[in-house]
């Protein structure tokens, strides 16, 4: 039976904590249904983690003890999140290649 307080809360759009919890759980279930999470086994995630670290380690020195790779779900989207603390770059600094348009713009500015 709905109490007067429940009716007022419903009319004003207020929700109970359990309703919020239920909604969050449902969103998580829906997100997992949309992405075939069963194909992302622990072995596959470990392999992805190693390959990502191998590529990044070619360019920068990583603090491997602090590396964190996880799957996070928010707003019906699952993301692979990698936190890779960088100690320093391998060559001392990272140099970015400029494309022709950027080079021309730099020359125009210097004139």
UniProtKB/Swiss-Prot annotation:
Coiled coil: none annotated. One of its GO terms (biological process) is regulation of division septum assembly. Keywords: Cell cycle, Cell division. The keyword S-adenosyl-L-methionine does not apply. The keyword Cell cycle applies. Belongs to the MinE family. HAMAP family: MinE. Prevents the cell division inhibition by proteins MinC and MinD at internal division sites while permitting inhibition at polar sites. This ensures cell division at the proper site by restricting the formation of a division septum at the midpoint of the long axis of the cell. This is Cell division topological specificity factor.
């Amino acid at each position: 039976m709905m109490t007067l307080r429940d009716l007022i809360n419903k009319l004003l759009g207020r929700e109970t904590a359990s309703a919020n919890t239920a909604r969050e759980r449902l969103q998580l279930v829906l997100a997992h249904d949309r992405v075939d999470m069963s194909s992302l086994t622990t072995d596959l995630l470990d392999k992805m983690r190693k390959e990502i670290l191998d590529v990044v380690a070619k360019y920068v020195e990583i603090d491997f003890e602090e590396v964190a790779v996880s799957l996070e779900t928010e707003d019906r989207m699952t993301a692979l999140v990698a936190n890779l603390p960088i100690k320093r770059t391998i060559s001392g600094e990272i140099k970015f290649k400029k494309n022709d348009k950027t080079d021309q713009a730099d020359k125009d500015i210097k004139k």
